[in-house]
Amino acid sequence: IALLDAAEAAGARLHFSQRLDSVDFGRRVALFVNDHDRTAQPQPFEALLGADGAGSGLREAMRPHVALVERFEPLLHGYKELEIPPAADGGFRIDPNALHIWPRGEYMCIALPNTEQTFTVTLFLPMKGERSFDALPDLAAARAFFERDFADALPLLPDFDTDWTNNPVSGLGTLHLGCWHLDGRAVLLGDAAHAMVPFHGQGMNCAFEDCLALDRHLAAAPDFETAFTGFEAERRPNAEAIQAMALENYVEMRDRVDDDDYLLQRALEQVLARRHPGHFVPRYSMVSFTCLPYATAFERGKLQREILVEATRGCRRLEDVDLAAADALVHARLPPLPAVSA
């Protein structure tokens, strides 16, 4: 609501229940249809900015006019949402200041808090296979699966039967495009250009970063085509980086958070972050709590992981790690963090 208010204050006109039906790029006219009363509204334009999501209507309209080189990579895992309701006293049933994960190797459950003292529980599971959504054809099979694999979560889900029956299984995937714009007439941003899986929680933030970058290029460029070309060149490496990190984070969350080597590396990561704040920042922190470009965080994250693996090789406990050698690796391989502006 705050964003809509800000948009209106800046002079934007908002039209609700309007679906992009078609675009005449030759005449520069977009046709919008109200699906409630079937009325159609032609709208002349100078340029179209498509922030209309993974199922973008503008992207579909652009397809005959420019080589989008569109590639969608399905995850082969789907998800179903359940709910932990408030406790009897109206409060949270479990700690709201944490991400709750039930990792099970090839699949997992997570729980995230909501403002109404509920939690949204999401089961991420392969679509096919021995343990998959295909292997849970009915409620009885689903309940038996939870009793076996998520026995401690099931008591938190008193409405499990209703939620499982009513909530659909949805798919996940990553969208890659070879081109985000049609000369100076249209450009895609956000999920319309680079939809990603949700495991880094950065889809919306990435789209907001797109908006800031596009605004800078529109202000500096002499025309729309130059602005769109520069915008895509700046943002593509960052979009590809966060798409890759989101996929990596899924494997980490479901399969590594209870691994001894991983836990030792995470412990050393925190130590090195305290000892070298100008050089070593955990990748998650770089992504979520700084304005470093995603591409920078991705590349530095690779170097940091190499350091952590090398420094902990043959170690069982943090006390076994040669911190002086780890310090030397940090200074030898990691340049100082670049200064960035918000």
Residue ranges and their predicted role:
Residues 1-6, 10:
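Active-site-adjacent segment of FAD-dependent monooxygenases/related oxidoreductases
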Residues 2, 141, 210:
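Charged catalytic carboxylate motif
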Residues 4, 143-147, 215, 232, ...:
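Non-transmembrane alpha-helical segments in soluble domains
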Residues 5, 18-22, 27-172, 176-181:
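Conserved FAD-binding catalytic core of PHBH/FMO-like flavoproteins
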Residues 13-15:
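General small-molecule cofactor/ligand-binding pocket signal
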Residues 49, 82, 168-258:
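Conserved mid-domain beta->alpha element of the FAD-binding
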Residues 216-342:
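C-terminal helical "tail/cap" subdomain of flavin- and related membrane-associated enzymes
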